[in-house]
């Protein structure tokens, strides 16, 4: 990945970090050699990392987590506030790890997971999807303004990408006579559990 290639190109002097709500969305863009990847732990109500990167969270992360802590189990990933918390963490990484302050190019990979989760759940036309993109636009504007003041205009390269698009809710498409349907996975859960119980004695797998 880009993070690993940047490490190699700078003789491993570059600082590379990943931030996202989903673990894979933070880990994969940052790469194998990243300094750290941080993601949201719903069961803890704050950001965490893995012992692959470090044995314990840095003190600054512990202090930051106290400022954004929510009740364990609260859904942050599937709401617009997840976007805000992602950018708050990204800004905290930028500040506390002193990215962009040295002679070597650093990299901060930020993945916005809430748009993906909400898009899958509600489709592209839902109010929920509108809300999360409005929040993303707002937070992105604030973050770019911060980069201008912190790193300086012309001193950073910013690029925006996506791993996939979205589609309308199947019910909306059918209203407009477009052949479409949804897969009701929950209809398969009962027979799946019954099959596993009969064959393996396992009470519940899903």
Please give the residue ranges for each predicted region.
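General structural feature for long, well-ordered alpha-helical segments within catalytic domains
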Residues: 2, 86, 136-139, 192
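Secreted, luminal/periplasmic, and some membrane-associated catalytic domains
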Residues: 56-58, 64-70, 127, 141-206
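Outer-membrane beta-barrel and related beta-rich outer-membrane complex signature
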Residues: 31, 122, 170-174
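His/Asp/Glu-rich, glycine-adjacent segments
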Residues: 1-104, 113-120
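Sec/Tat-exported extracytoplasmic proteins
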Residues: 7-10, 93-98, 116, 137, ...
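Glycine-rich loops and low-complexity Gly/Arg-rich segments
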Residues: 41-46, 133-136, 183-186
């Amino acid at each position: 990945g880009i993070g690993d290639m940047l490490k190699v190109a700078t003789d491993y002097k570059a600082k590379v970090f990943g931030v996202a709500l989903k673990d894979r969305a933070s880990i994969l863009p940052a790469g194998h050699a990243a300094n750290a990847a941080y993601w949201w732990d719903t069961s803890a109500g704050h950001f965490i990392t893995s012992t692959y990167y470090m044995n314990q969270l840095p003190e600054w992360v512990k202090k930051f987590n106290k400022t954004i802590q929510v009740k364990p189990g609260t859904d942050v990933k599937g709401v617009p506030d997840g976007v805000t918390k992602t950018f708050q963490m990204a800004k905290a990484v930028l500040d506390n790890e002193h990215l962009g302050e040295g002679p070597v190019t650093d990299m901060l990979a930020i993945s916005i997971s809430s748009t993906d989760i909400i898009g899958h759940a509600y489709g592209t036309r839902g109010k929920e999807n509108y809300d999360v993109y409005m929040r993303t636009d707002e937070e992105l504007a604030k973050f770019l303004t911060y980069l201008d003041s912190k790193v300086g205009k012309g001193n950073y390269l910013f690029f925006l990408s996506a791993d996939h698009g979205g589609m309308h809710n199947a019910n909306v498409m059918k209203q407009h006579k477009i052949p479409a349907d949804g897969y009701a996975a929950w209809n398969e859960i009962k027979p799946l559990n019954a099959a596993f119980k009969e064959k393996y004695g396992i009470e519940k797998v899903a």
